[in-house]
Amino acid sequence: MQGFDQKFRDLPDYILKITYQIWEDKDVESIREYYAKGIPVRSPAGVVYGPDAVVKATYATLEEFPDRQLLGEDVIWIGNEHDGYLSSHRILTRATHLNDGVYGKATGKNLIYRVIADCACKDNQVYDEWLVRDQGAIVRQLNFC
C-alpha cells in the first residue's frame, strides 16, 4: 500500500495491527503517529478533534477498564492508493470495570460488548473516524437498568 508502512499488507492488516498496538500493547501514544492532526472522531456522545483528544479518551477508558481487550472480528473495506481507503471494523470487546469513571463506581463486573469503528485512511494515517459502542450492553451488564 503506497504511503503506508511496509509492515502492513493491506488495509485490514493496518486496522487490526494499529488497534492491537494501541489497546493490547497499551501503546496509547502511537495514536499520535496513526491519527491525523485535526481528525474528527464522531460517536453518539459527540465529536472530538485531533490525536490529543483521542489519546486523552483512550487513557481514561484504560483507567476505568485496565484489562480491556479489543478482539477484531472483521474489517470490510474499499479504496485505493490514490483516493485512500474506507474501513468498517467490527470489534468484540472484553473488559472488567475495575476503577471509577464515566460508568460510575467500580463494580468489578466483567463485560462483553461490541463496537463498530468506521475509518477513512490515507498515507499511514486515519483522518476520519466514526465510533459506535453498544452502550446498552454495557449498562445492562453493570446492572444500571
Where in this protein do the model-derived segments appear?
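C-terminal and inter-domain tail/linker signature
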Residues: 1-145
